Curated annotation (Swiss-Prot):
GO terms for cellular component: cytoplasm. It comes from Citrobacter koseri (strain ATCC BAA-895 / CDC 4225-83 / SGSC4696). Monomer. This is Ribosomal RNA large subunit methyltransferase M. SUPFAM superfamilies: S-adenosyl-L-methionine-dependent methyltransferases.
Length: 366
């Protein structure tokens, strides 16, 4: 098995390919990416047979921006017989995976794959039973064993392989299933909700998204992102010249400040969160975010960077490198993650958490 499949947003295959090629090369793993426009996935083929396994085990999935999921696969299975698709799949996985903890039969996130997804749902039950009989899956689901992936790219045509539960997306097809809240003021609320699920471990929510925290939402109108913070019982300063939804103002938790998000300066020193979804050039937003972090105006931030039409991976990489350089220059240790979320379009979402000062004499967050 010398290939890695990476699922991505349709239309962003080139960015996904550029990223995996770059980040694999930094680990001295070389290969080439097979890219098909709007396919919703990329196949990265390694020159050395064991390198695909190295990628899915050692390249942190959390470091990838454009990939929704990542798993190692073998050769493409073609023309599966309609009367017995199971036997060839079991044959491909025998000797490759032993006692996997979960099965995911998936497709790319495209309109063309919607019919295929119906088949995948029906096919999962008999395939799971056959894989359990063959010892490829355990008799019960467990998050401690590898995930078995069967990825259909067309009827009767699939890749088979696996990923590791501590280095993959926990979500089917890499997509969290979120429901739009009827009382939210805009659909953008789902971006922040998804970001919280992707960037913050579930067992840390009560501590890091606690009742009574203070938060700032820059460019808040009409309040889609503020809504998520209010839902977590935070006190929110919503900064925007445009009006906020009355339903949010009625909670008593929101202070609306009619100011430009780029000019606003906080007057409290205990702000836990700053969030920002402003339509502006990514370099300008990155500079503002770096300013907030360097000055210690917030502990954690989630913000969006709008992408240009070309060289998107390069642009995002430069923006993240700028923020990292500013933090390094001021002796601030921080954790930076970026991801193009399912609910993002021509943008990526970034999370930065200040951890501690790298120089003596300063105490930041633990």
């Amino acid at each position: 098995m010398n290939k890695v499949v990476l699922l991505c947003r349709p239309g962003f295959e080139k960015e996904c390919a550029a990223e995996i090629t770059d980040k694999a090369a930094r680990r001295e793993i070389f290969g080439f990416a097979r890219v098909k426009d709007n396919a919703g996935y990329v196949v990265f083929e390694c020159y050395q047979p064991d390198d695909a396994e190295k990628i899915v085990k050692e390249l942190p999935f959390s470091s990838l921006i454009f990939a929704r999921q990542m798993f190692v696969v073998g050769e493409l299975l073609r023309d599966l017989p309609p009367d017995d698709r199971i036997t060839p799949i079991v044959g491909m996985l025998q000797g490759v995976v032993e006692k996997g903890g979960e099965l995911r039969v998936e497709v790319a996130d495209t309109n063309e794959s919607k019919e295929l997804m119906k088949f995948c749902r029906k096919f999962t039950v008999p395939l799971r039973a056959a894989l359990r009989d063959a010892g490829i899956l355990t008799n019960y689901e467990t998050p401690k064993r590898p995930v078995v992936h069967v990825f259909f790219i067309a009827p009767g045509c699939c890749y088979t392989g696996y990923s590791y539960p501590d280095n993959n997306s926990p979500f089917y097809m890499g997509i969290p299933r979120l429901k739009f809240p009827a009382d939210a003021p805009s659909r953008s609320t789902l971006k922040l909700e998804e970001a919280l699920h992707v960037f913050i471990p579930a067992d840390e929510w009560d501590e890091r998204l606690a009742n009574g925290m203070y938060a700032v939402d820059l460019g808040a109108c009409p309040g889609g992102w503020t809504y998520q913070l209010v839902k977590r019982n935070m006190w929110v300063y919503s900064v925007d010249n445009g009006p906020m939804a009355q339903s949010l103002m009625d909670t008593g938790q929101v202070t609306w400040l009619r100011e430009d998000g780029f000019r606003y300066r906080p007057n409290r020193n205990n702000i836990s969160w700053m969030v920002c979804d402003m339509v502006e050039k990514p370099a300008k937003v990155a500079a503002l975010m770096a300013q907030w972090l360097v000055n210690g105006w917030c502990r954690e931030t989630i913000f969006n960077l709008k992408l240009p039409m070309k060289k998107r991976y390069e642009e995002v990489s430069q923006n993240l490198a700028y923020i990292q350089a500013q933090l390094d220059e001021h002796g601030i240790n921080a954790q930076i993650q970026a991801r193009q979320l399912y609910h993002d379009r021509e943008e990526v979402t970034v999370h930065v958490r200040r951890l501690w000062a790298a120089v003596g004499g300063r105490r930041d967050e633990r």
